[in-house]
Each structure stands twice: as C-alpha cells, then as structure tokens.
Amino acid sequence: MATPTATDPAPPPISARSADMPAILGHGGPPPWLRRLGRISLTVVAIGALVYLFVPIVVVVIYSFNKPLGKYNYVWHQFSLDAWADPFKFPELKDALLLSLKVACVVTIISVILGTLIAMAMVKYRFKAKGVVGTVLVLPLTMPEVVMGFSLLTWFVALNWSRGFWTVIIAQVMFSISYVATTVRARIRGFEWRLEEAGLDLGAKPWRVFRLITFPLILPGILAAALLTFALSLDDFIITYLNSGIDQTFPIEIWTLKKSRIPPQINVFATTILLVSVAFALLGVYIGFRRSKKLGQLNP
C-alpha cells in the first residue's frame, strides 16, 4: 500500500464531503412518488395488522348478544340479552371459570414472590452459578409448551402424584417464574442500591428499608409481572391439560364443549375478561402518567 507524501493533496473535510452527498445520491434520495408509495404501503400494512388483531375480538363481543338458532353460536340470528341476563346458565362453565380464577390467583402470588426474589438476586449479587441460573430462566420462555407439559407429567407420574389442583399449580409456576423474573429484572436493572445502603446507615432495619425504599421503586415492574402471569395462567391450555385431573379449567372446558355446543355465554365470559383486562391496562397507563407527572414536577 502506497504511503501519502507531502505533495499529495489533503482529503476534503467531512462537511464538504457531506455537502456533495445529495449530488452523489441523486439530489435528495428517492423520487417523491416512491416516498409516497412507501408511506401508503406502510399505512396499508399497519391497518391490515390492526384489523387482523382486533376483528376477532370485536366478533366475540358482538356474538355475546346473539340468540343462536341451534347449539352453536357461529351464525348471527337475532339480537338478544339472554346470555347476559343468565351468564351462569351452564354450571360447568361457571365452575370452570371459578377454578381458572383460583388457579391464576395462586400461581400469580407464588410466581411473583419467587420471581421477584430471583430477579433481585440476579441483579444485586454476584455468584458463580449466575450464568447457569440466567440460562435456566430463559429455557421456559423458549421451550415448546407441549415439551414442558409432557416432561412435568412424566415427573408427576414417576413421583406417583395424583393429577389435580396442585399439579396444575406447580406446572404453571414452573414457566411463570421465568416471565416474572425477566420482567422485574428489566425494571430493577438500573436501580440505585446505594439508597438501600443509605437507609441501613441511618439505622433502619432491612425489612423497613425494603418496605419504604426498595418495594415502592420496583412496584411497577412487580405489577406488570403479576398481570402478565395472571393472563398467562388464565389462558394456558396445553400444560394445564396434560397435568390436570377431573376438574377442568375454563380453556379446557371450552375445548370440551365445542364438540356438543358453543353457547353465547362463552362470549359473555370472554367479553367480561376483555373489559377487565382493558380496565387494568388503562389503570396502569394512568398510574404511569401520574408518576411521570410527579417526577416532572420534582425535576423541572
């Protein structure tokens, strides 16, 4: 490679080369019609994605007001409030929904406690098996549910455990902990642990420091993890189906009923769950807005 000499002209400055870029690229990039086509294409794709996501939800809500001709609520026949007036017409649906809510509450409480402790340990402390623990936490997020469900079923059979409520709890906690730990870990990654040290230096007990300093700061991450865990537990089918006993959760009951009938009460329950989920989402947005507003007032 030739070395530059004193007689070689100096390269032009970066600003001069940047000024020549429009001439090289064609005076401002692509032509206007191509940019307009790109914007239109992006808009069409975005609208199509939204329609694909929300039209099934709208159909579920609309068909909760349907009075079907037969046993299957597939074809619109007549507007009616019968399903809303008597949502518990089928006792098996009510029992399945109550069981799903009970399972989801227990799984959420256990997973949030264990997942939060694991996340705090992963961020706050250094230990030799930290990489192994991180890998184990990621495995349930990437493993197919049928593989995890069947492996847990094999384990329960080997231990001679009767499948039922607690086997479902254990199975769901096994994959829910990963979601909680990942969510809370992302929240507390930038946490200032010196605040805890300052509280301890001032004479506060460790529990008081956690209650007054640590917990309020990581609470948004814990709430987000709790809502995610509750939704995943309520929705889970494969792992629950493989490890459940005689009693059936709501998704399993719907799958069983589809062989004989699809009553509009299913749409009523689905719409109710949707409205509750939207209410919690709006509440989270409101709380986040209030917190941002307070921080803005403290740091003008």
Predicted regions and their residues:
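C-terminal transmembrane helix and the adjacent membrane-cytosol boundary/short C-terminal tail
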Residues: 2-32, 39-42, 129, 185-196, ...
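Cytoplasmic-entry segments and transmembrane alpha-helices of multi-pass inner-membrane transporters
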Residues: 35-46, 50, 117-152, 196
